[in-house]
Design a protein with these regions (language model features):
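Noncatalytic alpha-helical scaffold of FAD-dependent oxidoreductases
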Residues: 2-449
């Protein structure tokens, strides 16, 4: 979720030479590298940019410490390193197997690149994030998600992964053959190895129609929360926490036989919007996906923002907490008590639901969940004061923070929230006994106290 202006992508791809893997610190020091939002500056100037999996193996062997960079859409230090980072942007092959209904993608591929490709060949993935510009591998490694009470997060689409281990060897794990190890390896937080390829399940392409309603009383969620979130294939509620109301309800309806593209004029007292809207009042909706019940392919409706626009910047901060769905309304009321602390620093909050899964480090591990997502103004000193207040309110609900977003929850608490944490720690020790892929984020949140 974001408020920034979007610029149309040129589609140009700049290819680096082989030697760019070894760009010197002197060459990069003049331009400090940051994440996409600009709120985090990476602590190394050593960025390796291999073109092939074989070159990835060489980089891994040559480095004592290494972290994968991804698409830089994380808001914390999960991808950071004080020594070496590796960008797999040029590992961008896509292989569709129509017979097995799978697609294998290189670690540099984004959902915005993948979706049109498989759609043109008659296929789809079941879910997408609100922004299409994140990398497939990075999103799956952090359990990033779209929405839908019956839809698992993006990681649940994974059926196999290929990664380079600390000794430089290639390892494959699959859902079909590797059982628990696979369940522990999908949401790997970048600590298992350098993931080079990932295989996703696909399904026949489908159409979606989207409409928006305005001004839903928050009281309607007390007795109708499940009904509201099940009213579409994917449903998002937006609020600024003022006036006990949901400012907008975005309903994405999966089309099929007998499914209408006509939305009723009222929805639990909320009014059907008469024009296309941006989640933030007063902002142009030009960059949002089509609304008002206009049918379109899945990849042009499931994200909130259009794929052929790419964000020029992201001057914002993000936090997100996952609570059990059966306590969702109580969690909403608990956060609402802090509205006057939250709203001055907030762009918007989005509420969305996700199905339970069995991936060890997923925020939805073994519990149907609701995510409470905050898009903040870039005011970190103030936001940093508000987060512990929110986290205290959500503590009774065992809220799990998004791995790639901002949080102040203590490491010991985070570890307690994941029943399979000891098994995950053992898995990391098996594949990376010397901690080559560990960084401060992993040391703190997975091993800290």
């Amino acid at each position: 979720m974001d408020k920034r202006q979007f610029l149309k992508a040129s589609g140009a791809v700049v290819t680096d030479t082989l030697l760019s893997r070894y760009i010197s610190a002197e060459q990069q020091a003049a331009t400090p590298r940051t994440n996409w939002a600009g709120n985090y500056t990476f602590h190394t100037d050593h960025l390796h940019q291999p073109k092939t999996v074989e070159e990835v193996q060489q980089v891994v062997k040559s480095c004592a410490k290494l972290r994968a960079l991804g698409a830089r859409h994380s808001f914390n230090g999960i991808a950071d390193s004080t020594e070496n980072q590796i960008s797999l942007k040029q590992i961008n092959q896509v292989e569709l197997d129509a017979k097995s209904r799978t697609v294998t993608v290189g670690a540099g591929v984004t959902y915005g690149q993948l979706a049109p490709y498989i759609n043109s060949r008659g296929f789809a993935v079941h879910n997408l994030a609100s922004l299409p510009h994140v990398s497939v591998v990075g999103a799956c490694a952090t359990a990033t998600h779209g929405s839908g009470s019956k839809n698992g997060n993006l990681s649940t689409e994974v059926s196999a992964i290929e990664f380079v281990t600390a000794d430089g060897n290639i390892r494959h794990l699959s859902r079909a053959k590797d059982g628990d190890q696979f369940l522990g390896a999908v949401v790997n937080l970048g600590a298992l190895g350098i993931v080079t390829r990932i295989t996703l399940d696909v399904q026949p392409t489908f159409q979606v129609a989207q409409s928006v309603y305005e001004n839903l009383s928050m009281s309607q969620l007390e007795h109708h929360l499940d009904e509201i979130f099940l009213s579409g294939y994917s449903v998002s509620l937006f609020t600024d926490w003022q006036n006990h109301r949901i400012t907008q309800v975005w309903i994405k309806r999966r089309l099929g036989p007998g499914v209408s593209t006509t939305f009723p004029p009222e929805f639990f007292g909320a009014k059907l919007a008469t024009k296309k809207l941006h989640p933030l009042a007063g902002h142009s909706a030009e960059n949002c996906t089509e609304q008002q019940g206009i049918p379109g392919p899945w990849y042009e409706r499931l994200p909130h923002f259009r794929m052929n626009f790419t964000p020029s910047s992201g001057a914002e901060l993000q936090t997100e907490y996952f609570v059990p769905r059966d306590h969702a309304y109580q969690a909403i009321l608990a956060v609402e008590q802090l509205r006057d602390h939250i709203t001055p620093h907030l762009f918007i909050t989005e509420l969305r639901t996700i199905a339970a899964d069995n991936l060890w480090m997923s925020m939805a591990y073994q519990r149907p969940s609701m995510a409470i997502h905050f898009t903040w103004k870039p005011e970190w000193p103030e936001v940093k004061q508000v987060l512990p207040m929110i986290e205290e309110k959500l503590a009774p609900f065992s809220a799990r923070p998004h791995w790639a977003k901002l949080s102040t929850i203590p490491p010991a608490t985070i570890q307690h929230l994941y029943p399979k944490m000891p098994a995950y720690q053992a898995l990391l020790k098996q594949y990376d006994p010397q901690g080559k892929f560990r960084n401060d984020f992993i040391d703190t949140n997975i091993y800290g106290s």
